[in-house]
């Protein structure tokens, strides 16, 4: 039995296929979804979503959204998403270093809005680096 997964952004379908298992970055922690999962609606955080195809795992970076499970269908509606195989480690590492520096600078200041923006950029860069295989 398989779980049908669709990852949808406002402008395209990033993933549409059957998987054995999915792990989502929910706002309350990592959430595993298997076939025959109970109906569920949850918020997603910025992070790495993993799907298992037979014995291989694929990573996708998701930038917040919602996930719905119903009748062996997992629909993931996100602001944006990238498949990990499409991200180069070098680019992801450069983005991560830049985001880390920006976050450190923002945390020295008192502008809360800039701190939040820098924190979001850091989470995105970290997720991209993880999906590219640069962080565990």
Curated annotation (Swiss-Prot):
Q: What does this protein do?
A: Produces ATP from ADP in the presence of a proton gradient across the membrane.
Subunit architecture:
F-type ATPases have 2 components, CF(1) - the catalytic core - and CF(0) - the membrane proton channel. CF(1) has five subunits: alpha(3), beta(3), gamma(1), delta(1), epsilon(1). CF(0) has three main subunits: a, b and c.
Give an example GO molecular function.
Answer: ATP binding
Q: Which UniProt keywords apply?
A: ATP synthesis, CF(1), Hydrogen ion transport, Ion transport, Membrane, Thylakoid, Transport
**Database matches in InterPro entries:** ATP_synth_F1_dsu/esu, ATP_synth_F1_dsu/esu_N, ATP_synth_F1_esu_C, ATPsynth_dsu/esu_N
- HAMAP family from the xrefs? ATP_synth_epsil_bac (MF_00530)
Q: What is this protein called?
A: ATP synthase epsilon chain
């Amino acid at each position: 039995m398989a779980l049908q997964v669709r990852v949808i952004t406002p402008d395209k379908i990033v993933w549409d296929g059957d998987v054995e298992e999915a792990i989502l970055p929910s706002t309350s922690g990592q959430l595993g979804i298997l076939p025959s999962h109970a109906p569920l609606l949850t918020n997603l955080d910025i992070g790495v979503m993993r799907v298992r195809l037979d014995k291989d795992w694929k990573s996708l970076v998701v930038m917040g959204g919602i996930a719905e499970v119903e009748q062996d269908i997992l629909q993931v509606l996100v602001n944006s998403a990238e498949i990990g195989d499409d991200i180069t480690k070098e680019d992801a590492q450069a983005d991560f270093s830049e985001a880390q520096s920006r976050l450190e600078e923002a945390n020295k200041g008192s502008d809360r809005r800039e701190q939040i923006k820098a924190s979001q950029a850091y989470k995105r860069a970290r997720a991209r680096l993880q999906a590219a295989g640069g962080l565990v």
